[in-house]
Amino acid sequence: MGPAFTFNGYSREAFAKIIDAGYADAVFAGNALATHDLEGAYFHTSLGQDIDTQENRPNGHYHHLDTINRVRYWGSIERFIEEEGVRDGIMNALVRNGVPYVLAGSIRDDGPLPCVLGNAYDAQDAMRSHLRKATMLHTIATGNMTPSYRVLADGTIRPVYFYCVDIAEFAVNKLVDRGSLASRGIVTNVQDFIANIAKGLGLWVRR
């Protein structure tokens, strides 16, 4: 997941509802997704813009840094959520439901948050531990680590289906070009996509 999921209140809420309904077994993302989601809970902004109106807030460009510093003060995302009374958002839903998440680092990260794995190999190993159980997968890196089938408890062999959703055609095509032939690409805005998924599952989403 990229941080675009947090830039609108409705997409942020939609994914939180999908997690609450038990449809997420694990979430892979980076520092930005967690940072801007927690910023949304703390300041009601993402990248300094109101998550509902997209209006710029005074000194909003500092909000994500203030959020990171506050999380680092408490020592963990879980403690930040507890101590700061966070009651909404993607990270809150993950923590509240006990859904595992892996946050991989980047050379572009501000901060980063305490639980972000700065070593790419450590992050890859952490993702692999969840991929063995996964049935829906995202991103080129994830796709390249994914087996083409899984063996069920009764010995049945079934294919693994996964979809890559991105606003750029290049991203979804690259996953197939690099060998993930089972991948199906969907070129769309992920914010609208995740809201439509939630609606299709019968979950209420404000719009």
Residues covered by each model-derived region:
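C-terminal functional extensions of proteins
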Residues: 51, 55-99, 106-207
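General beta-strand structural signal in soluble alpha/beta enzymes
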Residues: 1, 7, 27-30, 101-105, ...
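Metabolite-binding pocket within alpha/beta catalytic cores that recognizes anionic/polar moieties
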Residues: 1-74, 187
